[in-house]
């Protein structure tokens, strides 16, 4: 990795904020010349072929997820950085854990690919991500790096953080070019993307990374949260779970949602999440997951 980039990251002044859950926002993350090369190369995004997912439901709309076959040269740099020990160290220090694992440590990123692009009309409703990887590592942190070459505040598209049940937006973060957002993930870390109203030729481009720990680090992490932020965050076992009828707050409800077939898929997952979080808890939901996995 470029020594200039390494030194810049090592000398970052990290200031954590704690509401609605721990996060930090870092502007001018990469040196300006590196960022310009990345954003300039992304102007060829319409030629990308390695499309993995294309979302078109009312809670996941106008969002495309790409693999890394198109991410050569400068475009691979953010993936390498976000998956590196440099960023892991920031999270490990905050959480008091060791041996953190990122998506970049797995073949095909564990199926959660690192480059996302959204365009006008796009929205990503309030949700919590999957709680565990396929091999049962606990998902504890996320990184989002904004790489559009320009973004006007009037275009929306903010990353938003919601209250701990996902029904009210508490904070919005503008996807400012060359801005990095790090946040601690838990079963109450509802987040999403506000509706985008950018010009049709302007895309909201981001790099994304998840971070995981072994269960053996769990108790130590919880104890550290109590000391550092005065409370422990909530963890249980669940898949990625959206707020099915109120994607960007209570006022976003539309009667047409009730007539959409996929709404009921989201409702089922949300009910499973609520039971796991508020009735079963971490240990028992984990026991049930292992029990049913063995049976299948």
PLM segments and residue spans:
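Non-heme Fe(II)/2-oxoglutarate
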Residues: 3-4, 13-95, 233
């Amino acid at each position: 990795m470029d020594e200039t980039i390494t030194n810049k990251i090592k000398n970052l002044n990290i200031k954590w904020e704690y509401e609605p859950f721990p996060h930090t926002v870092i502007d001018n993350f990469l040196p300006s010349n590196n960022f310009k090369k990345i954003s300039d190369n992304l102007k060829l995004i319409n030629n990308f072929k390695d499309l993995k997912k294309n979302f078109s439901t009312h809670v996941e709309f106008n969002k495309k997820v790409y693999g890394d076959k198109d991410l050569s040269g400068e475009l691979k740099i953010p993936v390498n950085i976000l998956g590196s020990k440099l960023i892991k160290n920031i999270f490990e220090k905050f959480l008091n854990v060791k041996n953190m694992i990122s998506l970049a440590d797995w073949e095909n990123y564990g199926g959660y690919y690192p480059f996302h692009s959204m365009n006008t009309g796009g929205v990503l409703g309030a949700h919590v991500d999957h709680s565990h990887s396929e091999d049962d590592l606990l998902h504890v942190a996320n990184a989002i790096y904004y790489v559009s070459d320009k973004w006007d505040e009037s275009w929306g598209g903010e990353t938003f953080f919601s209250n701990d049940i996902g029904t009210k937006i508490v904070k919005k973060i503008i996807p400012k070019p060359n801005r990095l957002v790090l946040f601690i993930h838990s079963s109450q870390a509802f987040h999403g993307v506000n509706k985008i109203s950018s010009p049709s030729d302007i895309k909201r481009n981001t790099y994304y990374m998840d971070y995981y720990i072994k269960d053996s680090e769990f108790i130590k992490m919880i104890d550290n949260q109590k000391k550092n932020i005065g409370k422990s965050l909530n963890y249980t076992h669940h898949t990625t779970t959206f707020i099915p009828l109120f994607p960007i707050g209570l006022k976003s409800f539309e009667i047409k949602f009730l007539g959409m077939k996929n709404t009921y898929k989201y409702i089922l997952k949300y009910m499973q999440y609520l039971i796991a979080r508020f009735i079963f808890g971490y240990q028992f939901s984990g026991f049930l997951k292992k029990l049913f996995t063995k049976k299948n």
